[in-house]
Amino acid sequence: MKISREAYADMFGPTVGDKVRLADTELWIEVEKDFTTYGEEVKFGGGKVIRDGMGQSQLLAAEVVDTLITNALIIDHWGIVKADVGLKDGRIAAIGKAGNPDIQPDVNIAIGASTEVIAGEGMILTAGGIDTHIHFICPQQIEEALMSGVTTMIGGGTGPATGTNATTCTSGPWHMARMLQAADAFAMNIGFTGKGNASLPEPLIEQVKAGAIGLKLHEDWGSTPASIDNCLSVADEYDVQVAIHTDTLNESGFVETTLGAFKGRTIHTYHTEGAGGGHAPDIIKACGLANVLPSSTNPTRPFTRNTIDEHLDMLMVCHHLDPSIAEDVAFAESRIRRETIAAEDILHDLGAFSMISSDSQAMGRVGEVVTRTWQTADKMHKQRGPLPGDGPGNSNFRVKRYIAKYTINPAITHGISHEVGSVEVGKWADLVLWRPAFFGVKPTLILKGGAIAASLMGDANASIPTPQPVHYRPMFASFGGSRHATSLTFISQAALEAGVPEQLGLKKRIAVVKGCRNVQKTDLIHNDYLPDIEVDPQTYQVKADGVLLWCEPADVLPMAQRYFLF
């Protein structure tokens, strides 16, 4: 029996050789592999396959998956493939071919009476996003992030305090305890970073033992060589990550001074281009070091005609500057440079910048990490053409490079890749389903720990789920004890050994960060390029390995106004 590709795609989704456009970008992906057995596909519905004695077996709950996502197109750093995905006990149990093993061949995911089904036909499945630059200014950020497809938030803060408005620090054991207790209320994986600015180890050690999964050095607290050295020494001892916002004003040294203070030790450099803060004008040099794990924040993603003007106003507010003070204005203007922002676009495309995050409410938008990433990818595709590794007529390699920037690479950087960050067997089932036309803009379904935590949903009083008004709403995994069972709170090993979860009465599942101190940039997937960066101190022009990096700002972006008319 034969079926046309068009009819097959309509029924079961695209298969090997088919191409799919991502939203309204010019990025096309091509299916590399299909795990199905043609003619044995499983699909739920009236008159369909997943029925008793057909695609559904008689096996007990222990032998079948709890949830099956059928015929989904997976986009992850490791591939672009079509598969059934089985979830069990909150984790990804299998990727492959689902069905009834009693009557169907090559089944590695058994369906039974205890199996729920999510139809993935014609849908794209990705890992939940990981945002590693969160200012916890207001709790409403968390729902905003979740509805955008982010399922893990890492950063610091205590609410709308002046310190938190500027820095991602949950300062001290008392504040750490309050924030860990607050994290129980949310269907979101959360980890908090303490304040790393101290020249003696004891004030930092007590924060790690209180639950901090990392330490944040910020110039507003004084990112001096002494505090950098001390902070990295504590991190090495306790296996937690260090993130840094370096010294924009070059008060305690220049970029070479800071890089020297690292002493080859692993560090995550926030907004490494510099508009978000850091040695002016050449902090961007840091992305060429093997021990530096560089990220961007999303307001500079991608470079557009509005980027410069927007940043000046944002900076004055976020860093408590006064526009009537000439020195404050000069400080702001020194950070915002067309030349380095343009270079940042290209360095992302080359894989020299490895991660993208938000800088939530502190010069960044918490709900736009995913969108800004794909807008950058599309801009670079249009301006620079296919990457080496892309196939004929597809952008598969570029897509893998960019999705890694907000999934697996932040997970590796912060020691949580054993739990989250990819669509792989054994990982926590934090998954996002997208309609291709809305990919990267508006997800359809967000799963946390194998349960549906958020979704597009129509009128609750309607006779079917789809009537307007359709908007994002929290689902059952966002409520009661379900959120405790399906979301993670990350803490340090030292805090676990100190009994912090029991002392604070934490209800969410606890996971420990590990392997933070031996990560090198070469470990960051598809984003491990180590260029020799030069910045002209007069013109701010950037060269990588002797090649000038410049691109024009975009006048129009995809994934923008046409998606947000309602």
UniProtKB/Swiss-Prot annotation:
Record's GO cellular component terms: cytoplasm
Leader sequence residues: none
Keywords annotated in UniProt: Cytoplasm, Hydrolase, Metal-binding, Nickel
Gene that produces this protein: ureC
PROSITE patterns: UREASE_1, UREASE_2, UREASE_3
Cofactor binding comment, as recorded: Binds 2 nickel ions per subunit.
Residues that bind Ni(2+) 2: K216, H245, H271
Catalytic reactions of this protein: urea + 2 H2O + H(+) = hydrogencarbonate + 2 NH4(+)
Entry-linked InterPro entries: Amidohydro-rel, Metal-dep_hydrolase_composite, Metal_Hydrolase, Urease_alpha_N_dom, Urease_alpha_subunit, Urease_AS, Urease_asu, Urease_asu_c
Lineage, opening ranks: Bacteria, Pseudomonadati, Pseudomonadota, Gammaproteobacteria, Pseudomonadales
Name of the protein described by the UniProt record: Urease subunit alpha
